[in-house]
C-alpha cells in the first residue's frame, strides 16, 4: 500500500506516472503528498487522471506543492510553498552537453554573500528575498519537527555524521 510518507517512511523523489492509477484502483491512500517542481497535470499524457486523484480527499488527504512558479498541478494543492530558483538554493547539476562526464555545484548567492559580510544565517531563507526556503533545509527541518524524539524513524535520516545526535546542517549535507 502507498501510505505514510509515500512507500515507506521516506521517499525523496516523485513517484511514477502510475500513481493516480494505483490510487484509483484502491492500492492505497496518500495521507500527505508533496509535489516538488512537478507538474504532472501538464506534463504527463494522462493529466486528467492526476486532477481526479488530487481532488479526491479519500485518495490524497493533503497535497502540498513546492514550486518556484504557479502551475496547473499547484492549482489543485491544499498549500503552495515557494521554492527557490537556482540562485536561491544548493543544487548538484549535470547535463548531457558533450561526451564528457562532469558535475556542477550551485549554492545560494545571497547566503554566500551574507557569509562574506560576516553574517551566518542559520537557514538560507533568512538571506533569500521573500524568505523562500531552500528545499534541502526545508526537508531537514520538517523531518525534525515531525519526529522530534526520533520514535517514527524519520529523524535518523537527518542526523549529522560529524556531531552525534545533532541535526544535519546544509553545509554538512554537501560536504
What is each stretch, according to the model?
Residues 1-172:
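Non-catalytic alpha/beta scaffold blocks inside enzyme catalytic domains
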Amino acid at each position: 500500500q502507498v501510505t505514510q510518507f509515500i512507500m515507506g517512511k521516506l521517499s525523496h523523489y516523485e513517484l511514477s506516472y502510475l500513481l493516480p492509477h494505483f490510487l484509483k484502483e484502491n492500492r492505497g491512500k496518500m495521507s500527505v503528498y508533496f509535489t516538488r517542481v512537478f507538474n504532472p497535470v501538464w506534463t504527463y499524457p494522462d493529466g486528467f487522471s492526476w486532477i481526479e486523484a488530487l481532488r479526491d480527499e479519500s485518495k490524497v488527504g493533503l497535497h502540498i506543492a513546492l514550486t518556484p512558479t504557479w502551475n496547473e498541478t499547484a492549482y489543485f494543492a491544499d498549500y503552495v510553498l515557494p521554492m527557490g530558483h537556482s540562485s536561491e538554493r544548493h543544487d548538484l547539476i549535470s547535463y548531457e552537453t558533450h561526451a564528457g562526464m562532469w558535475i556542477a555545484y550551485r549554492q545560494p548567492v545571497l547566503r554566500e554573500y551574507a557569509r562574506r559580510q560576516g553574517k551566518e544565517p542559520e537557514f538560507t531563507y533568512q538571506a533569500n528575498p521573500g524568505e523562500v526556503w531552500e528545499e534541502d533545509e526545508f526537508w531537514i527541518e520538517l523531518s525534525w519537527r515531525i519526529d522530534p524524539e526520533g520514535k517514527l524513524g524519520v529523524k535518523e535520516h537527518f542526523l549529522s555524521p560529524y556531531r552525534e545526535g545533532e541535526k544535519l546542517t546544509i553545509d554538512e549535507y554537501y560536504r
